[in-house]
Amino acid sequence: MKTKVEIKHWITGSILFEFECDGNSILKTLLEAVRLKKDLQGADLRGAYLRGADLRGADLQGADLQGADLQ
């Protein structure tokens, strides 16, 4: 079943990027946004499981990563 995940701005709540696929997760959505070189400044990634994610080239300036698993 396809699931849509949205990455929102942590202050305004506006949608920065959304992605829909089978077995979707915040990690898959974030990696797709990075692959497409989307602007993720201010992204709300609090508590996200991002272990092992290759975020090179991602623009996460001002993103909220509080409690995110980045190791």
Which positions does each model-derived feature cover?
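Extended, small-residue-rich solenoid/repeat segments and analogous flexible loops
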Residues: 1-71
